From Swiss-Prot:
The lineage of its organism: Bacteria, Pseudomonadati, Pseudomonadota, Betaproteobacteria, Neisseriales. GO terms for cellular component: cell outer membrane. Belongs to the opacity porin family. It comes from Neisseria gonorrhoeae. InterPro entries: OMP/PagP_b-brl, Porin_opacity. Pfam families: Opacity. GO terms for molecular function: porin activity. Keywords: Cell outer membrane, Membrane, Signal, Transmembrane, Transmembrane beta strand. It is found in: Cell outer membrane. This is Opacity protein opA51. Residues 1 form the signal peptide.
Length: 234
């Protein structure tokens, strides 16, 4: 039961819109990791996407300060990209040499779950509006994978004698990069928002939170979230 003066346990349900920024640090083609050349393109190294997901919280209101535990699951991101480039290497004596480069990439990223603990301070202003700020620490589980293949083909096109051109394959090479990880880390974030008291027990909540999930091996992941929800105090 409610203890009066705004104190008591509460539950909250939110619908959140998340902007997700995922940065992968795959081996480069130069520098200290040049012996581990990666075929991963910039598109999969620096991913910006978004998702909509539910979030539930259980907490206690001390009449100014609040503490809460929350849980959320995020949408799985996946994409694929194919590109081809043909570069002319030589063209003389009715013989033309070209280099064809094909890249096929398939990637997934899934913030499977986030279990957080937050401390929030409500500013008591006149009226029913209550701005708040807070901090959050969370245990996150992330899965990601990449499958990238780069194939090059060098071929000769001969038009000697004015006959129909004949194409000869001279050389083929193929490089691949495959990686799959399932990682758990503790990250930190900040919270801000405004609550509006519909009734003494029911509050409409609109909020923002930034969370840095920590460095997940060769991946950095952060989210910006805007949410709308309701909070009920018992």
């Amino acid at each position: 039961a409610s203890e009066g003066n705004g104190r008591g346990p509460y539950v909250q349900a939110d619908l959140a819109y998340a902007y997700e920024h995922i940065t992968h640090d795959y081996p480069e083609q130069t520098g200290t990791k040049k012996d581990k050349i990666s075929t991963v393109s910039d598109y999969f190294r620096n991913i910006r996407t978004h998702s909509i997901h539910p979030r539930v919280s259980v907490g206690y209101d001390f009449g100014g300060w609040r503490i809460a535990a929350d849980y959320a699951r995020y949408r799985k991101w996946n994409d694929n990209k194919y590109s081809v480039d043909i570069k002319e290497l030589e063209n003389k004596n009715q013989n033309k040499r070209d280099l064809k480069t094909e890249n096929q990439e398939n990637g997934t990223f899934h913030a499977v779950s986030s279990l957080g603990l937050s401390a929030v301070y409500d500013f008591k202003l006149n009226g029913k509006f209550k701005p708040y700020i807070g901090a959050r620490v969370a245990y996150g589980h992330v899965r990601h994978s990449i499958d990238s293949t780069k194939k090059t083909t060098k071929f000769l096109t001969s038009s000697y004698g004015g006959l129909n051109p004949t194409v000869y394959t001279e050389e083929n090479t193929q490089n691949a990069h495959h990686q799959s990880n399932s990682i758990r880390r503790v990250g930190l974030g900040v919270i801000a928002g405004v609550g509006f008291d519909i009734t003494p027990k029911l509050t409409l909540d609109t909020g923002y939170r930034y969370h840095y999930w920590g460095r997940l091996e060769n991946t950095r992941f952060k989210t910006h979230e805007a949410s709308l929800g309701v909070r009920y105090r018992f």
